[in-house]
Curated annotation (Swiss-Prot):
Gene Ontology annotations for the cellular component aspect, listed alphabetically: cytoplasm
Entry-linked Pfam families: AIRS_C, FGAR-AT_linker, FGAR-AT_N, FGAR-AT_PurM_N-like, GATase_5
Species the sequence originates in: Pseudomonas fluorescens (strain ATCC BAA-477 / NRRL B-23932 / Pf-5)
Assigned protein family: In the N-terminal section; belongs to the FGAMS family.
Spans annotated as Disordered: 301-328
Binding positions for Mg(2+) per the UniProt entry: 677, 716, 720, 884
Residues reported to bind ATP: 305-316, 384-386, 676, 886
Subunit structure: Monomer.
Protein name: Phosphoribosylformylglycinamidine synthase
A GO MF term: ATP binding
Amino acid sequence: MLILRGAPALSAFRHSKLLEQLSQKVPAVSGLYAEFAHFAEVTGVLTGDEQQVLARLLKYGPSVPVQEPTGRLFLVLPRFGTISPWSSKASDIARNCGLAKIQRLERGIAFYVAGEFSEAEAQLIADALHDRMTQIVVANLEQAAGLFSHAEPKPLTAIDILGGGRAALEQANSELGLALAEDEIDYLMNAFQGLKRNPHDIELMMFAQANSEHCRHKIFNASWDIDGQSQEKSLFGMIKNTYQMHNEGVLSAYKDNAAVIVGSVAGRFYPNPETRQYGAVQEPVHILMKVETHNHPTAIAPFPGASTGSGGEIRDEGATGRGAKPKAGLTGFTVSNLQIPGFEQPWEVPYGKPERIVTALDIMIEGPLGGAAFNNEFGRPALTGYFRTFEQSITTPRGDEVRGYHKPIMLAGGMGNIRDEHVQKGEITVGSKLIVLGGPAMLIGLGGGAASSMATGTSSADLDFASVQRENPEMERRCQEVIDRCWQLGDNNPISFIHDVGAGGLSNAFPELVNDGGRGGRFELRNIPNDEPGMAPHEIWSNESQERYVLAVGAADFERFKAICERERCPFAVVGEATAEPQLTVTDSHFGNSPVDMPLEVLLGKAPRMHRSAVRENELGDDFDPSTLDIAESIERVLHHPAVASKSFLITIGDRTITGLVARDQMVGPWQVPVADVAVTATSFDVYTGEAMAMGERTPLALLDAPASGRMAIGETLTNIAASRINKISDIKLSANWMSAAGHPGEDARLYDTVKAVGMELCPELGITIPVGKDSMSMATRWNEEGVDKSVTSPLSLIVTGFAPVADIRQTLTPQLRMDKGTTDLILIDLGRGQNRMGASILAQTHGKLGSQAPDVDDAEDLKAFFAVIQGLNADGHLLAYHDRSDGGLLVSAVEMAFAGHCGLNLSLDAVAENTAEIAAILFNEELGAVIQVRQDATPDVLAQFSAAGLGDCVAVIGQPINNGEVSISYNGESVFTGQRRLLQRQWAETSYQIQRLRDNADCAEQEFDVVLEEDNPGLSVKLGFDVNQDIAAPYIKKGVRPQVAVLREQGVNGQVEMAAAFDRAGFNAIDVHMSDILAGRVDLNDFKGMVACGGFSYGDVLGAGEGWAKSALFNSRARDAFQGFFERTDSFTLGVCNGCQMMSNLHELIPGSEFWPHFVRNRSEQFEARVAMVQVQESNSIFLQGMAGSRMPIAIAHGEGHAEFESEEALLEADLSGCVALRFVDNHGKVTERYPANPNGSPRGITGLTSRDGRVTIMMPHPERVFRAVQNSWRPDEWNEDGAWMRMFRNARVWVN
């Protein structure tokens, strides 16, 4: 084993944060130093050259002075017997660099902690420094040799039920954490006595996962009686009723990993499987929809819990039909009170929590980062979501109970696209190869399906922790690339059947695969790729290692499939083959036995059906009179409530522009305020049709009136999605995610009554279908604190997500008030028809109350009429701004519109209030509705259209936006409230700031918080030195000559398709080139005029951002020659964007005239930054930017390591003076800036793009390829037509070639 010291592992900011954490736990800690330690398993002795290559490979990241360590060593390593994702990628890079003697590289962190402390304190320090699921702590570097020890496989265990009877099975149930019910134990006893043998632990584990509540949805399929009355339908039966009543537009429901609905016809853009040339294929582009929850893991370990939640949902989409493509994601969180230190709110009463779960604040610091990190690295934009906190002591017939979300809701969902011929699964022929695609087996996430089916606190803490999986998004990206290559083959798609691997691991996925395909299967356990050879058979078969799919590929298609996997460097293995008889057999060649041999019907057959008996309980509630409250104080409380406050901290961490198909994200208008009601994507790059997603949830209402909470969730979804241009309400399809504390008094009846209200009544009345959903039935947390039994139980929680095809993405409405459209009116549409019910409102919650009357959907016809009128007004161009009324009521809707419009408000309540006692209820009730802005001269016509639709009583003019920064509300000429917009907006932004300050670099958080106070901030703007609508490449395109550009990617790159689309539009033939093509000599760069290195996370940014990719080009002789030859050709051009920019900057020794280029390192905020930033094009030789110098315009930013670090002050000066700086960040006033967030990475002198001296090679961190169409821009000037400003850059390259 070789030991190589690495660079310091912590930035100054992370160092001081960790030191503070440690000294809080152990006050004796006086100092801390951390550095990476690398370990190499080698065969033979490395030559001098090989040592040099290895040393350069392991030098990565920012330049930080290395210290001589002092203090006690805590060496954190991957768990012995495992291979970390870092190791597999770094080892791949080493092999690609020609280091054949390196068997494996592994990395640890050496923490040196100064101070005098006891062994018990040392244990506390060790606990704080590692993740016990995947890591261990040792005391010296030599002990790392254990990383490369090879463990012996553990044997199979039989459970002696023939000798020990039922008691033996009960003991196994408890020890293995199987969560089997009494009748299931009876069922298994009968089954194995019938087979005349003892079951193996692997078979019991497999049965428990496959038959857990999590996988089988027993409660939703159960028979019911309520108050002694037998009920006709199951819960699932009532959901399916929506499909039986209205199934038009639904292509697949209830039977696959996601539902599929009809989309639009468009030119789907992808590389031709034979020629690898990108092009558009005109075809129906159907929409798939899915929303998952990952609540249990997120309570225990929020980052991996939320991360693998997003990863699992992405796999569900990819594994739909015969393979599909995920497109856009959403994330939601519901937690208990945050209790932010120093920012505790008056309604937050501390109640405590069990040891085994983390605090609500920790969930909201770590969880969103996990979800965002997976989506970012996979390459899926995160475009909408919700965040709610609720925790309150409620008086019930049994005394006081705390209701809240100690077991959180973590929602991960999204939509994708699928080809018409792949919507239905294919046929599995006998002899088909049964394949696992993706990562290796590891001992993580064991028993997750069963664990998540229990109330938190009823299983052991170790089992809880063991059931959380860990993530490797770059592996999932490789799998998706394989799936993409397969569906792009159309009728020749080699995949006949595919499932994702989720709860229960392969033990659930493979039996489900063969059973759904009407077959049995024979499997060999030792064919499963395994990074933990010491595992027992049941651990190999049932672990929930992530990023895996199982599929059936016909024998005739196998070679083609194998070639695709090898090109994408995606691991796969043939584990078994399909058999005609429905028997499940798993052999083990190591031990020469058969751990599983059973008929499929024993595993998946009719285990006993559950029956539920429920009793209705009187609804809860208390008295709440808002009329006595101080309005100004009420506004501040409501604006601080997390459900209302700015969600900025959740949004800027997630890439929202990847794919180049995003038409509407959360951030709205020139000031980029996070208030959008709906997310919208384009079908493809050549049309204006698209897809919309929006969410609705009103969970606290369920405590007052559960069916009302369900109806309101659907109502809110519709008032949100109404902001997009949808032809008719029945085009909208819903996903319903149900969370309940099943078995808690009153909750089962609330669940049944709410499903009935939604499935049998409201949805059929609206003509809307629910083709997909998910349930989580154990939403309670119980623990004992100093002898006192405590519990927190969630309200019944229905989270609804709406999906729909969009007729015209250009007509999406936003809440931004327009001050450039003359005199305008604000109109309130109140679907509550003046009832102003205040039950469970945010105002009530901020005073520790529930109220008594819940808002509700009283008449489905009102909702239908509202939707139709809004769509008509939008189609006619009458609506300037739109915002639904939701949490916080009318007051919040109106001020959020003012925040987005950077203006004031003059509101009068004369038309809606009858007396002063009603004012608070009118401002803060959360009945369904919306506020719209229309031109004053159109107001009479707009009101008349609502009247004609039967909504005349619901509409009233409530005021006007005004150009000064004042918000004033009056009634009968008397002032009700007056305040400054910027101060209200600061109150609204403060909760987000407080979390950001704890999570990220606090200086950056403060700078962003201060921007809100800038009254004179002009927002984003465009100042161009060229005509955006002129196509300067047109004369060359007309000649029909299309030069070839190599669209270069490496494993983990995810931005290639939009890059190809931009070059294609500019008149190039864009060709898909993988680094594996260059390393294998399949592609010759001499065939290309241009090369572009795309954005993403090559090798998951192992060995530094873009550095592994660059080094596999520098240290592989064939690749080095190819790149060097290309760069030296004077007729060639090169572009590197984001990860491609980082990669190219590390190739500067091959690129003439780039010797002073910087290295790109971690952003100053220490966070992934996804924003729209202003840049100014500099005077330079860049062939891409000719004729654009001096232009200022917005551009998409999405990176975690974009800070330009120059080798020296002299190099920075040289870059500046040589005319090689191509782009700089500027603030909204047009001044070059280093200030956050206008400069999101803190690069010196605003530098974010550079060129070589002759201008042929240009690198930049921003993403012009995501905003070349006008509709791709989060904000754009009204006068832009089809092209965005950045299209000019690609056309410049086409002109240069000629």
